[in-house]
From Swiss-Prot:
Gene name linked to the record: RPS3
EC number of the protein: 4.2.99.18
Catalytic activity field: 2'-deoxyribonucleotide-(2'-deoxyribose 5'-phosphate)-2'-deoxyribonucleotide-DNA = a 3'-end 2'-deoxyribonucleotide-(2,3-dehydro-2,3-deoxyribose 5'-phosphate)-DNA + a 5'-end 5'-phospho-2'-deoxyribonucleoside-DNA + H(+)
Topological category with respect to the lipid bilayer: Peripheral membrane protein
Keyword ATP-binding tagged: no
Protein name from the UniProt record: Small ribosomal subunit protein uS3
Keyword Transmembrane helix set for record: no
Family statement: Belongs to the universal ribosomal protein uS3 family.
Length: 253
């Protein structure tokens, strides 16, 4: 028998489930370019779509790893047998995904690359992917014992208003180095896309679009138009009546 819960408790439970699932997959699939998760609930089963840049690593050899993840999720969250399915979906544009770029920068710093060089490489890749603007902030013990923050900005970036919710993609990651923990924050401003593939369909509120005027076709030959409208082809037209001729003048004596 299904337990009835209020709408408020249902929203809270769904939020906790997605947050815990995201945390688990972030730790488990960090090296495979994990970029987010989508949960779709149907009447018969729950579908979990894992977004990643390297989907082959997520699936594993002959689908072994995805089956292991399915079993762990099913056991942890108490799903009935066969009621949960995990799928792996490749990120269409890796350069426009903030999570993927934050993970990329994290592994560059772990590999010993200089902070400035790593950040400029990520910045350039994001802008070449077609974004409108981006911002990368790295904070912590970058040089010496004094903690500081370095910000790298390119293009246009909005910081306030409702468009931030659907135009700006943000990701925060932490990397543990020998000198301490560094914080990484990546913000990517997407471009307006009417098709909705690489950006939001809704344009910015201050966007002004100028419609090009249509080319006017000028007549090359003079055209005569009837004033009263088109004549009826069934009714024959009467020839115009001539005014009566004036009588010749009478000579006077």
């Amino acid at each position: 028998m299904a337990v009835q819960i209020s709408k408020k408790r249902k929203f809270v439970a769904d939020g906790i489930f997605k947050a815990e699932l995201n945390e688990f997959l972030t730790r488990e699939l960090a090296e495979d370019g994990y970029s987010g998760v989508e949960v779709r609930v149907t009447p018969t089963r729950t579908e979990i779509i894992i977004l990643a840049t390297r989907t082959q690593n997520v699936l594993g050899e002959k689908g072994r790893r995805i089956r292991e993840l399915t079993a762990v999720v099913q056991k942890r969250f108490g799903f009935p047998e066969g009621s949960v399915e995990l799928y792996a979906e490749k990120v269409a544009t890796r350069g426009l995904c903030a999570i993927a770029q934050a993970e990329s920068l994290r592994y560059k710093l772990l590999g010993g690359l200089a902070v400035r060089r790593a950040c400029y490489g990520v910045l350039r890749f994001i802008m070449e992917s077609g974004s409108k603007g981006c911002e990368v902030v790295v904070s912590g013990k970058l040089r010496g014992q004094r903690a500081k923050s370095m910000k790298f900005v390119d293009g246009l970036m909005i910081h306030s208003g409702d468009p931030v919710n659907y135009y700006v993609d943000t990701a925060v990651r932490h990397v543990l180095l020998r000198q301490g923990v560094l914080g990484i924050k990546v913000k990517i401003m997407l471009a307006w896309d009417p098709s909705g593939k690489i950006g939001p369909k809704k344009p910015l509120p201050d966007h002004v679009s100028i419609v090009e005027p249509k080319d006017e076709i000028l007549p090359t030959t003079p055209i005569s138009e009837q004033k009263g409208g088109k004549p009826d082809p069934q009714v024959p037209q009467q020839p115009p009546q001539q005014p009566p001729a004036m009588p010749p003048p009478v000579p006077t004596a």
